[in-house]
């Protein structure tokens, strides 16, 4: 058991020298100022999207919905695009019930005509899109020798070409206003590859290339272009995996768990915020350590 000692004059002087004990009001004021500063910084990061128009594709469920909720929490006005009209309407109704300003746009990103019509409707409604999140994506997995050309084309069309066409359709107002945030959802597979997913990996690697190239084109106009590369995330896409497949996947994750849509959404919100205004052409990995490359 430790014995307590009465404080000596020497220890009192030491505490005074280090600001301990002798000046409680100064310490309290300092802590209060620190707490206030931290709160202000948190508010700046969390709420600096006030009034910004944000479009999230694939926004009806999963990662897309989580992104929409995070951006709304930071003050953004939402435009949600999805091909699933019924699910999209349900999601927007639920968001509105929470007091979130959200508008639904039915868009099929595999169709150039649908993208053009959707972009036109969005611009007519809001005049501009300041934050674009290219989230819509699908998988059609198979081994190379068994993969059908139609499955290759569909995955590339939705995951890559759709993002290209929509970004192209909405870029002009960003250039004119000299401000914009473009964030595309890539994948750890686009960074490291994966057997049985040559189409998906190619589409996501292509999205990373698009991100870095476009970042160089538009940086001088105040527009940042980045990507988030999720790993093993709890989504409808991964829900179909068997218990054995899930265990095998988790064995490759140093953090030992699946990520959540919110993990990805918070990364997107950061890249859309002023806190990330000096970051462009970057791929932010959200994968629990599955991939640690450059």
Where are these regions (language model features)?
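Substrate-binding pocket helix/loop in short-chain dehydrogenase/reductase
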Residues: 143-144, 148-156, 238, 249
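C-terminal helical subdomain
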Residues: 227, 251-275, 279, 286-288
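Canonical Rossmann dinucleotide-binding motif of NAD(H)/NADP(H)-dependent dehydrogenases/reductases
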Residues: 48-78
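Short C-terminal tail/terminal secondary-structure segment
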Residues: 38, 44-45, 192, 269, ...
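Alpha-helical segment proximal to the catalytic Tyr-Lys
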Residues: 172, 216-220, 277
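Residue(s) in the substrate-gating loop at a strand-loop-helix junction
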Residues: 187
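Active-site helix of classical SDR
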Residues: 167, 203, 211
């Amino acid at each position: 058991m430790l014995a307590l000692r009465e404080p000596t004059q020497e220890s009192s002087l030491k505490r005074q020298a280090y600001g301990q004990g002798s000046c409680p009001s100064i310490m309290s004021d300092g802590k209060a100022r620190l707490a206030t500063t931290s709160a202000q910084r948190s508010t700046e990061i969390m709420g600096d999207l006030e009034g910004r128009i944000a479009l999230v594709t694939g926004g009806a469920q999963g990662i897309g919905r989580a992104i929409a909720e995070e951006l709304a929490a930071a003050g953004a006005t939402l435009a949600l695009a999805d091909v699933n009209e019924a699910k999209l309407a349900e999601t927007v109704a639920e968001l509105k019930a929470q007091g979130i300003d959200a508008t639904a746009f039915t868009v099929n990103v595999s169709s150039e005509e649908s993208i053009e019509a959707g972009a036109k409707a969005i611009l007519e409604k809001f005049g501009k899109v300041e934050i674009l999140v290219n989230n819509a994506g699908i998988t059609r997995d198979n081994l190379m020798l068994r993969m059908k050309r139609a499955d290759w084309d569909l995955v590339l069309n939705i995951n890559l070409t759709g993002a290209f066409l929509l970004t192209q359709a909405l870029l002009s107002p960003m250039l004119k206003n000299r401000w914009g945030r473009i964030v595309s959802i890539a994948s750890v597979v686009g960074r490291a590859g994966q057997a049985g997913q040559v189409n998906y990996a190619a589409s996501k690697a292509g999205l990373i290339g698009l991100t870095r190239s476009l970042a160089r084109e538009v940086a001088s106009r105040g527009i940042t272009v980045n990507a988030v590369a999720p790993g093993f995330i709890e989504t409808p896409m991964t829900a179909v995996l068997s218990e054995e497949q899930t265990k095998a996947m988790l064995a490759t994750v140093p953090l030992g768990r699946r990520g959540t849509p919110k993990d990805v959404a918070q990364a997107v919100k950061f890249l859309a915020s002023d806190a990330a205004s000096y970051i462009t052409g970057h791929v932010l990995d959200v994968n629990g350590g599955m991939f640690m490359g450059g």
